[in-house]
């Protein structure tokens, strides 16, 4: 097993070979020290957001084959620092991450006192007006103030009036210091005279409204049917019917010239006159104007602020009863309120903690693993056979233990028949690669299936002495009857097999009724369910049809019959006769071998495997040379033989590149591609890969990948911007009120018609048969 180790800045990456799942983090540090010249004490290793600590194995952190572990080098510690202080210093400075606030910051109230004083002054609505001697407005006067970001008007009060030099060098400008009544957290805001005006107080009657008038209206740009904020608007037209009155206007968004045209004003009875500067009638007129607090609508859209209605949104999230506000806690995560006596268990007093989280939002601190702490015990791994085994054998070096690095998503796991893009004769070095390709999903088990559905694939590895392999047909022995306790992979037959689990699944593939007593034979065996067959090199000693190395996909077979009999071990076993039923030639035939050459099929290795093997061989050669030099000899050292030199020296010249047979499209497929005019550019890109043979299918998969689900598009919607998305994915996006293309954010509009691209769906179904299963 091998992994990649990369520095945090990404500048240096090295492969660490000869690892096991049981390799300790301490041992890994030693190997990293040799490659990066960094002492183990200065190494901080991270994998998937977790800091790897000594005492654990890489299996504890679920590190997979060829995965990347990040290395952060600690700064060299000064010699004067005591060892007990070392850890405390490294926690913040070396990681490059900021820690919590300092004590001085926590105790600081700078910035809050101004807001609190502003809020306190806001409570004195009856304060006397003070004339500053310049400007239209007095201190403590109620006005309407514009928010410069939104362009909307809000109720405010002037707290200070000052002068500032004009930008053009003319007369001094007057600056009004105002605070918004409903938003005290904004503090005091400085505004020019054009952004402040007397509090609106005059409501226009219907007959007074005329096109071209500039008025003040309530409008919600996000949801026009709901109550929003107050904007200036120019009336464009009005219409009156027997049942309703409608006003349409242009919403003015500040002085920048931005506007929203032809907007329907929902609240026609709340259209206000814009007061001119200096037109305030007196101190009481502004504060008692119709435009007062609450004019932006009820705070709770569920209960409409009805005090008689219970509401779990604006009040206690458990009982919803509007009482005891002094005994309510507000969750700092979800902003929901909870009565102290409604919690489970109930609280007798309000907690002193600054932050409080409800039971749904709270994270259990005991389950959080902090940097420098050991991992918590995993219940799942505690149940594994390896956890309770007393064996000292290192089981973590096998390729069956490394886990998949990718997963086949072209077809579902319960797919019958060939996997698109995997021709007969495909070779893999390890079983885990067969699993990644989707041909045979289990890493170790010989049969993949479901006892209530059937078997999808099997591996012929010569594991049972009763197996007989004749190439186009073979007799297969079922699974079970062996004691595999203690994490064993194989054992001698120790009891009778039963027609259950995978044995029953394989029996369901036979075109005959299931008989768990005597077995059954199909009258028309070709009508049975197909089984993908993989032959392993482990069966080479029993069968000449097995590959010399690795695992080979040999095509589709079908179950002819199955029956119980006494095996060579003396126990009852279930036998299955399978015959080949595939259009592609078998890989051991002349035609099959020629096809393999034409398709350019060679052994497939895991990523980084060849480099790891080469490095291991080089290390072994260097070690042998060192041993020879250290061995005392009387004469001169013998010269290497010619055969050894040829073996060690690299092959001269580049190997001749084999010509791969091009992928052939049927006339129907070519016609469908031609009909898909919307994706002509993408098809032109994909068609360039026809010369690569089976890799053409992989190219099509890459080109027509849905950006949302990362699978081949199903029921594809080709958008205006020439992107393809699954209809279900786009519907989910629209349901979340996101009306843009998931790929480029082009605005599709709320009423976008989702028409399925039928030619594209048809060609994808032919290239990837069965990929639509489970996606309806």
Curated annotation (Swiss-Prot):
The record marks 477 as: Required to confer preferential recognition of cytosine over thymine. A zinc finger (PHD-type) spans 297-364. Phosphorylation at Ser-649 is required for gastrulation. Residues 290-299 are annotated as: Linker. DNA binds at residues 461-462, 467. Residues 464-467, 476-479 are annotated as: Required for formation of a 5-methylcytosine-binding pocket. This is E3 ubiquitin-protein ligase UHRF1. The gene is uhrf1.
């Amino acid at each position: 097993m091998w992994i990649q180790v990369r520095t945090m800045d990404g500048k240096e990456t090295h492969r660490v070979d000869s690892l096991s799942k049981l390799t300790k983090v301490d041992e890994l540090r030693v190997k990293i020290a040799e490659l990066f010249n960094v002492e183990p004490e200065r190494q901080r290793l991270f994998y998937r957001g977790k800091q790897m600590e000594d005492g654990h194995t890489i299996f504890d952190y679920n590190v997979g084959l060829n995965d990347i572990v990040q290395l952060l080098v600690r700064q060299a510690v000064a010699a004067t620092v005591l060892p007990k202080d070392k850890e405390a210093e490294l926690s913040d400075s070396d990681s490059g991450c900021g820690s919590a606030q300092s004590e001085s910051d926590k105790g600081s109230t700078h910035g809050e006192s101004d807001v609190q004083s502003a809020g306190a002054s806001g409570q004195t609505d009856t304060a006397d007006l003070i004339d500053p001697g310049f400007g239209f407005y007095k201190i403590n006067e109620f006005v309407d103030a514009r928010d410069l970001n939104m362009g909307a008007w809000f109720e405010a009060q002037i707290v200070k009036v000052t002068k500032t030099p004009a930008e053009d060098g003319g007369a001094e400008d007057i600056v009004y210091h105002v605070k918004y009544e409903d938003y005290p957290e904004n503090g005091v805001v400085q505004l020019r005279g054009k952004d402040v005006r007397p509090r609106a107080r005059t409501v226009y009657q219907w007959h007074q409204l005329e096109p071209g008038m500039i008025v003040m209206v309530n409008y919600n740009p996000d949801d026009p049917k709901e109550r929003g904020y107050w904007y200036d608007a120019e009336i464009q037209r009005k219409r009156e019917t027997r049942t309703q009155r409608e006003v349409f206007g242009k919403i003015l968004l500040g002085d920048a010239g931005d506007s929203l045209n032809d907007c329907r004003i929902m609240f026609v009875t709340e259209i206000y006159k814009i007061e001119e500067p200096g037109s305030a009638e007196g101190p009481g007129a502004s504060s008692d104007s119709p435009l007062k607090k609450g004019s932006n609508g009820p705070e709770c859209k569920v209960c409409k602020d009805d005090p008689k209605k219970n509401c779990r949104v604006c009040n206690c999230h458990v009982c919803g009863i509007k009482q005891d506000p002094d005994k309510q806690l507000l969750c700092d995560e979800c902003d929901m309120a909870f009565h102290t006596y409604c919690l489970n268990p109930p609280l007798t007093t309000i907690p002193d903690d600054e932050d409080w989280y409800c039971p749904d939002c709270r994270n259990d601190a005991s389950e959080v693993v902090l940097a420098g702490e050991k991992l918590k015990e995993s219940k799942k791994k505690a149940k594994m056979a390896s956890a309770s085994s007393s064996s000292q054998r290192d089981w973590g070096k096998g390729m069956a233990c490394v886990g998949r690095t990718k997963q086949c998503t072209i077809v579902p796991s319960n797919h019958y028949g060939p996997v698109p893009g995997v021709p007969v004769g495909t070779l893999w070095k390890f079983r885990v690669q067969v699993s990644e390709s989707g041909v045979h999903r289990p890493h170790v088990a010989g049969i993949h299936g479901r006892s209530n559905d059937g078997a999808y694939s099997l591996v012929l590895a010569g594991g049972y002495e009763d197996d007989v392999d004749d190439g186009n047909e073979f007799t297969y022995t079922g699974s079970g009857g062996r004691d595999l306790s203690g994490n064993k992979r194989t054992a001698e037959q120790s009891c009778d097999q039963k027609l259950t689990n995978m044995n029953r699944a394989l029996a369901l593939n036979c075109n005959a009724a299931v008989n768990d007593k005597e077995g059954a034979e199909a009258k028309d065996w070709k009508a049975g369910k197909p089984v993908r067959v993989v032959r392993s090199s482990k069966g080479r000693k029993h069968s000449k049809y097995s590959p010399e190395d690795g695992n080979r996909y040999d095509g589709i077979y079908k179950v002819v019959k199955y029956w119980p009999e006494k095996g060579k071990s003396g126990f009852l076993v279930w036998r299955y006769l399978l015959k080949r039923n595939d259009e592609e030639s078998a890989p051991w035939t002349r035609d099959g071998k020629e096809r393999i050459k034409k398709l350019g099929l060679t052994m497939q290795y895991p990523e980084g495997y060849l480099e790891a093997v080469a490095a291991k061989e080089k290390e072994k050669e260097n070690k042998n040379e060192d041993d020879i030099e250290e061995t005392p000899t009387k004469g001169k050292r013998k010269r290497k033989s010619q055969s050894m030199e040829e073996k060690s020296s690299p092959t001269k010249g580049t190997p001749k590149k084999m010509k791969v047979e091009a992928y052939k499209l049927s006339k129907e497929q070519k016609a469908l591609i031609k009909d898909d005019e919307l994706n002509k550019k993408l098809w032109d890109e994909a068609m360039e890969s026809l010369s690569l043979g089976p890799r053409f299918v992989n190219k099509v998969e890459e080109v027509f990948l849905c950006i949302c689900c990362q699978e081949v598009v199903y029921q594809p919607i080709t958008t205006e911007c020439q992107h393809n998305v699954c209809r279900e994915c786009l519907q989910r996006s629209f349901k979340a009120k996101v009306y843009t293309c998931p790929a480029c954010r082009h605005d599709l509009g709320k009423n976008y018609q989702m028409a399925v691209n039928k030619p594209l769906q048809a060609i994808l179904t032919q290239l990837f048969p069965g990929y639509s299963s489970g996606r309806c």
